Amino acid sequence: MSLEPFIDSKPFTFGVELEMQIVNTHDYDLTKAGSDLLRLIKDEKIPGNITPEITESMIELSTGICTTHEQAVADLRKIRDTLVSAADHLNVGLCGGGTHAFQQWSERQIVDTPRFQYLSELYGYLAKQFTVFGQHVHIGCPDPNSALYLLHSMSRFIPHFIALSASSPFVQGVDTGFHSARLNSVFAFPLSGRAPFVLTWDSFEEYFSKMVHTGVVNSMKDFYWDIRPKPGFGTIEVRVMDTPLSVDRAAAIACYIQTLARHLLLDKPISPKEDDYLVYTFNRFEACRFGLAGTCINPQTGERKTISEDILETLDRIAPHAEALGSGNALAEIGAIARSQVNDATWLRGVVEREKSLHEAVRQQCLEWRA
């Protein structure tokens, strides 16, 4: 199977995907209602799409192609309201968060589609453990070589995206000590991590052909990389974020990525090198484990900062691009998160500390999603 052609798209357009938790409303455990929700909303007109995910306790929403922060917020709120109305009709709840706080993975039911059943056979229990919930952001690229440049230069900022979105401190009733425990589940898959270091589309096509020849992959969907090209959309897809607890935060993070992309492609401040990845896994771990207080090492200078400090300095650098895109309000929210060092994981721990109940924490997650 050959790699599909890269469709050139309008630079810096973006789309947002959010994987959502579906919970019951008596003890707020996950429940099997994905197919029922899809049946209920199949005739609704929304500015995007709603699709099944690998288990019946999940659903994915996606916006259309957005150009501004204002549009992304409006699209996400409209889709959210449609889903919440349908969920209320079924007497189930919806919430964000990268993991469910106390669900047992063995109770999950794989959705009955050929691809999901194939993944279940291939990966065994990992498929059910993959009931985790992420935000993906697509960024439009003018050509395939620009997409690969953006992919590798954007990798420098992966710790920012993880720490800002982190919302998965609890797994199976236990505080993991991580801000984003979700990514530990993703990292278990053999084709996860970072993309190979190639900077031309010809080289990427050659790599893809070799992987297909080995029988390891059939399509780009088989790669679970932190950032991957999506040739059929003409985008790169940033995949490291936990699903935030609110659509407004999801939109702000998406626009931070959009603004960074404009800075990287127009200003070309980074010359990507293979050695940039020497600290990649360390920086990624620090963001997952410690959130905004984690350490971030600049791969080119070796300078160490906290992730929150690095975000604030980055916001200063990209301010002209925020003005050009109209994303000032989004980046103001990102700055407030970085200065306070309070992400959704910190908020969730605060709820559990006050209420002494993971069930109550999930109930409040549902309220945050509706707000």
UniProtKB/Swiss-Prot annotation:
Q: Which PANTHER family match?
A: GLUTAMATE--CYSTEINE LIGASE 2-RELATED (PTHR36510:SF1)
Protein family membership = Belongs to the glutamate--cysteine ligase type 2 family. YbdK subfamily.
- The membrane spanning regions, by residue number, are none
Which InterPro entries does the record match to this protein?
A: GCL_type2/YbdK_subfam, GCS2, Gln_synth/guanido_kin_cat_dom, YbdK
Q: Name one GO biological process term.
A: modified amino acid biosynthetic process
SUPFAM superfamilies recorded: Glutamine synthetase/guanido kinase (SSF55931)
Query: Which Pfam families did the record assign?
Result: GCS2
Q: Which keywords does the record carry? A: ATP-binding, Ligase, Nucleotide-binding
The protein's role, per its UniProt record = ATP-dependent carboxylate-amine ligase which exhibits weak glutamate--cysteine ligase activity.
EC number(s) stated in the UniProt entry for this protein: 6.3.2.2
Catalyzed reaction equations:
L-cysteine + L-glutamate + ATP = gamma-L-glutamyl-L-cysteine + ADP + phosphate + H(+)
Q: What is this protein called?
A: Putative glutamate--cysteine ligase 2
Molecular-function annotations in GO: ATP binding; glutamate-cysteine ligase activity
Q: What class of enzyme is it?
A: ligase
Q: Where on the tree of life does the source sit, at the highest rank?
A: Bacteria
